[in-house]
Amino acid sequence: MSMSLGTTSDSDGTDSQSQLVNQANAAGIAVIIAMGNDGDEEVPSPAAADWSIAVGAIDNNDNVNRNDDDLASYSNYGPRQDDGDNDRWDELKPSVVAPGSNIRAAAGHANFFGDSNAQGWSTLSGTSMATPIVAGLAALLLEADGSLKPTSTTNGVRD
């Protein structure tokens, strides 16, 4: 499940949205969620869920050399607020980063503001552009091995 949404506040992963993500994970659904575009050291809900695959964005600096890729200036980064469970690993967010800057994407003939777009595409940046890339990778992993559990899918995406 790919989600490009979130709250505007920092979360410790115990809020209701985060708990729903954890329940989906327990039901066998990998949940990939955008980290947000405030450029802040915060992790909003539902990306803050213990079992979310929280996605940050990288900027390729307009070249193909991967050695100079940086966390995009707009991408939120963690760690998440401590939830008091003595597990420091679940505070580490984002879970993964992916290209999110200057992504060419399909667009309708009118944008959110009602402006005309005759080309049918747009160039966008944000963690919401990085998230579907990670979701696509997760789908390929699940296609290759349908027995993967969400945790294994998360590890596969990281590798």
Residue ranges of model-derived segments:
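Mature extracellular/periplasmic domains of secretome proteins
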Residues: 1-2, 13-31, 40-57, 68-98
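Solvent-exposed loop/turn segments at secondary-structure junctions
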Residues: 6-10, 37-41, 53, 58-63, ...
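Generic structural "secondary-structure junction" signal
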Residues: 7, 73-79, 105, 123, ...
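Extracytoplasmic/periplasmic, Sec-exported soluble proteins
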Residues: 9, 13-16, 38, 47, ...
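Hydrolase catalytic cores
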Residues: 45, 100-159
